[in-house]
Amino acid sequence: MVLSQNLFYLKITTKMIPSRTYQAHQSRLTMVLFVLEMEWMLSTGQDKLFTWHCSETGERLGNYRTTACASCLQFDVETRHVFVGDYSGQVTILKLEQDNCSLITTFKGHTAGVTTLCWDPVQRLLFSGSSDHSIIMWDIGGRKGTALELQGHNDKIQSISYAHHSRQLISCSADGSIVVWNMDVERQETPEWLDSDSCQKCDQPFFWNFKQMWDSKKIGLRQHHCRKCGKAVCGKCSSKRSTIPLMGFEFEVRVCDSCYDTITDDQRAPTASFHDSKHNIIHVNFDPTRVWLLTSGTDKVLKLWDMTPVVS
């Protein structure tokens, strides 16, 4: 842009000129992230490698081999931690130095591949979306190992963004649904499912418990689990369905009859709003300054959404 005689002249170039080529992977790339503060180029690929290069010289600084094909990544500038999600459903946390890295830990919570990650450096929260239709919030800053599960989609999660000023999470799935989650509420962790050979409510044997079936002369039943208490129950003792928004269940799920009676109407109040983008979403970009959401779909259409009515 040139300033002359109080007029602005904008020169528009329609040609991009490549300046450097990085020989980073031996297979298809899945994610590239440029870290301006470090002048690093981070990348993941289907060759199960995470690599980082110096953007100034093009030199490879290091790499790390993941257990499965990496699919997404995020980076924390302050601590130099990188979060790598892969198709096995786990998130690997690495500490990067100038020319080496060290494994910190791995998060395992999804039953299918991790498709997207979102990192909030202010509250130190990591959000992971997966092909299992779920989102998990990992509270790293709290240092208590808290992991909150969010269930509000019927297809794989394509993208997630976090508006830390209003503490709202925006998630989009392949079926076109956009969900805005209120994270400024006191949520509860989902309980672990308990193992038992018989119903923990009526003591009826499950179908693999041959000894109790023979002793009681009763036919074995199928095992289910209450989403509120985690107990192993039979179908008769878990005939009720209910939403449990504070546990992340915005859709009705199976609960045992005794837990159903303890859920109040206030506890069933939704903590998320649902919207239809009317196209199958591939990728999303959220602008928190203007509160705009850009979605791209398989229909070759870009849609720009004004999110001010739903994002405070």
Question: Residue ranges of each PLM-predicted region?
Answer:
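Conserved strand-to-loop turn within each blade of WD40 beta-propeller repeats
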Residues: 1-5, 37, 44-47, 78, ...
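Structural hallmark of WD40 beta-propellers
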Residues: 18-20, 38-42, 51, 60-62, ...
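Short C-terminal beta-strands that terminate individual repeats in beta-propeller domains
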Residues: 10-11, 18-24, 44, 60-66, ...
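Intrinsically disordered, low-complexity regulatory regions in eukaryotic proteins
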Residues: 115, 119, 125, 134, ...
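Cys/His-rich Zn2+-binding "zinc-finger" mini-domains, especially FYVE domains
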Residues: 184-258, 262-267, 277
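WD40-repeat beta-propellers
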Residues: 7-12, 50-55, 91-96, 135-139, ...
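A conserved positional marker within WD40/Gbeta-like beta-propeller blades
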Residues: 3-7, 40, 49, 90, ...
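Canonical WD40 repeat/beta-propeller blade segments in eukaryotic WD-repeat proteins
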Residues: 27-34, 63-75, 112-119, 155-162, ...
